[in-house]
Design a protein with these regions (language model features):
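Sec-dependent N-terminal signal peptides
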Residues: 5-14
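N-terminal secretory signal peptides that target proteins for export/translocation
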Residues: 1-2
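N-terminal Sec/ER secretory leader and immediately downstream segment
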Residues: 60-62
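Flexible, surface-exposed loop/linker segments and immediately adjacent secondary-structure boundaries
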Residues: 22-54, 58, 67-182
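Sec/Tat signal peptide C-region and signal peptidase I cleavage site
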Residues: 17-21
Length: 182
């Protein structure tokens, strides 16, 4: 009886994991050069991006990804990133977005998830974790645990009346707020 029950639970969880990993979460808006996913499928303009995908943007290549919550990710050459979590409710703009940049350069323009709840967008890098607070920023990371973070979008002294954003960088021990562009 116990073995049958455990087998049933295992099969059920396998189906849930399979359905989550095939959840459409965004689209490649622009693809230039050699861009593949973990299945070694070539990604082109209009290719769908799914929960759990790992994207590989090769040398002399770049891509722009548009997510359902209107987050825009511009991915530079020699970048590897994984979408660890993406949950979005378009009715309430609630959700969670976690990406892991193993190497390369990615520019973010945060979307509705971060605007509704800034703590719900997280970027993992070899050097630590970054939380975005409704802004535009760039992350450049290498596999040697070095990362550069640049705040691009409206800082506290902007003259356009825009709500200032910031990013928060943590290495697991220390936390730093980046509040001014540059």
């Amino acid at each position: 009886m116990t073995k049958k029950f455990l087998l049933t639970i295992f099969i059920f969880l396998s189906f849930i994991t399979k359905s989550l990993s095939s959840e459409f979460i965004g689209v490649i808006g622009v693809a230039v050069g050699d861009i593949n996913n973990q299945k070694n499928e070539k990604l082109i303009n209009g290719s769908k991006v799914f929960f759990g995908d790992t994207l590989y943007v090769k040398s002399k290549s770049n891509a722009q990804i548009l997510f359902l919550d209107e987050t825009v990710m511009t991915v530079g050459e020699n970048t590897e990133l994984t979408i660890d979590d993406f949950v979005y409710d378009p009715k309430t703009n609630d959700g969670n977005f976690v990406t892991n940049i193993k190497s390369g350069t990615v520019k973010f323009i945060t979307g509705k998830i971060s605007k509704k709840n800034p703590d719900n967008l997280e970027v993992k890098m070899p050097a630590g974790t970054l939380g975005a607070r409704g802004t535009e920023f760039l992350v450049s990371s290498n596999s040697d645990k070095e990362s550069t973070v640049l705040l691009l979008g409206p800082g506290p002294d902007n003259t356009l009346g825009m709500i200032p954003g910031n990013v928060q960088l943590s290495d697991g021990i220390n936390m730093t707020d980046i509040t001014k562009p540059g």
